[in-house]
Amino acid sequence: MTAAQDLARTRAETIAQIAALTAEFDEVVAASASSNADDEHDPEGATIAFERQQVAALLDQARRRLEDVDAALARTATGDYGRCADCGRPIAPERLAARPQARTCIDCAR
């Protein structure tokens, strides 16, 4: 599998994850709308608020990953993919296999 194919697969998986998390977030928001507005005295209120924050954080993380994957796809088009953005050395194939959207080598990432 080429780097572009691997990135395209990762992009599709990330888009699917964003869609699932968006649906889950919408469900949590709907549940919070039908719960007691007084979170302090509603035993489920705090749980719903926590779940809403957790899903929102996961959604934000997935959106950032999509931006990283799109940037990596752009680097494949320019021929810069697999080269560290900081030091210019090649990024180890093992790192790219684990994190295809990586823009830095292990040394620079530390």
Describe the residue ranges of each PLM region.
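Solvent-exposed, flexible loop/coil residues
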Residues: 54, 85, 100
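Interaction interfaces in information-processing and related assembly proteins
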Residues: 1-78
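Short, cysteine/histidine-rich loop/knuckle motifs that typically chelate Zn2+
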Residues: 85-87, 107
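Glycine-centered loop/turn positions within well-structured domains
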Residues: 82, 94, 103
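Short metal-coordination and nucleic-acid-contact micro-motifs, chiefly zinc-binding Cys/His arrays
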Residues: 77-80, 101
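Cysteine-rich micro-motifs
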Residues: 99-110
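Short Cys/His-rich "knuckle" micro-motifs
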Residues: 70, 94-99
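Short functional micro-motifs and their immediate structural scaffolds
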Residues: 91-92, 110
